[in-house]
Amino acid sequence: MMVILRPGPYVCAEWEFGGYPWWLQNIPGMEIKRDNTEFLKYTKKYIDRLYQEVGPLQCTKGGPIIMVQCENEFGSYVSQRKDISFEEHCSYNAKIKGQLADAGFTVPLFTSDGSWLFEGGCVAGALPTANGESDIANLKKVVNQYHGDKGPYMVAEFYSGWLSHWGEPFPQVSASEIARQTEAYLQNDVSFNFYMVHGGTNFGFTSGANYDKKRDIQPDLTSYDYDAPISEAGWITPKYDSIRSVIQKYVKYPIPAPPAPIPVIEISSIKLERVVDALLLAQSIQPVNASTPLTFEQLNQGYGYVLYTRHFNQPISGILEIPGLRDYAVVYVDGEKIGVLNRNTRTYSMEIDIPFNATLQILVENMGRINYGSEIVYNTKGIISPVTVAGKEITGGWNMYRLPMDKCPVLTEFGDNVCRNTPLQAVQFKDRPVIYEGEFTLDQPGDTFIDMRAWGKGVIFINGKHIGRYWKVGPQQTLYIPGVWLRKGENKIVIFEQLNEVPQQNVNTVRKPVLMNLK
């Protein structure tokens, strides 16, 4: 199998921050995606290290890599960042290409952009390829224009489906349309790369987000099924069969049969034996104190949650406003839930009444950094601007408790705070963030999908593996668990449930994903 490598350093791909490490934002003088000394220093480090791993695998050295991409859809960024001169954009783009060449990449280099954005995305010496281009005559016209009147002609991203956001319908593209376009490419000697041919999963906190003026942020699902020809779990679909039938007409050998289906199991009930109130974690975590709320980055935390608290010696009431919320917050006073603020719905304020000697608690979640477009440069998380009540900024006495949740919480570390998850305790913990824990035994592991339709919002760990976020708004209501992460015998599950509006005693898995249930 031959490989076309698209290494970035910017990859987009609905990945958190487009593949950039969050801590770049903490480096003084750093400006990403431009001709900036600090940024280019780190891109060079990355590319040089990348070459150590994959350089020997180029076809020029007997390996499978036949092409390497420079940057990614840079033309769209150029079109959105008119505040940066076109000359600087071109200089940056050329320097990334130069770093790839200097590192030792000798296979052909290429760029990928929408065909109408080639002017900003193309770089001398690299083949321009088009993303999402179905007009073959136009494809050949623009490639000729920017590549010396010659091909080859390639669609680097032929969209077999589309990306999915929380709170929005799951996009679908018909199998017949994909088959028709596949045949058109083959008839006209156009190379193409299905994006995606195989769906996947944004495990952990790796899913990114888009920016939208109406919704501000559009967080991506954990599932990256993409309505692809091969599903998230590796299942062939009618779309795959349609594509296979078309391709068979253009090759002189029989295409091998698809592999046998992966075993799938169903777990009818997993009892969640133990529970801990996450608001009590402040008793076991050393807080960071500041006069104003600090961002995740200032707290040296990339992902997960931060609990912001502030004690009041005098009563105060009115409108609580957090215009700089990034991205989702559940607000409590002395552990009693007051409401939810949500950047995705542009809900930044609520009525609040804080009595004498009470504590305001704000549990803030990073829902994923923007991975595409000009807003990628504004990606700090947490509370990034003043908090006000009745128009008055609340300063002094802020405590911040870091809950990164990048690793599975170990409930035994919380001592006496851990309770048996009985019906009585469930009522007591209603509307409070909790961590559930349980065990289950399997005779034979297999792929499965954990069913979260009865739950609210949170993350799940299976045998220590972070399988991602769930959220009742949908459309995704199940999370994929690869069978290789399950064991014959005892297995452990840990669930962090942020809302706990309907406390649970059990959870189950199903044999098929639920990806189109929007609430």
Model-derived regions, located:
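Substrate-binding cleft/loops of secretory-pathway carbohydrate-active enzymes
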Residues: E73-F105, D113-G148, G200-G208
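A cross-kingdom feature marking solvent-exposed beta-strand/loop segments within repeated
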Residues: D216-I217, S223-D225, K239, P293-Q298, ...
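Catalytic-core region of carbohydrate-active enzymes that cleave or remodel glycosidic bonds
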Residues: D102, N131-S231, W235, V246
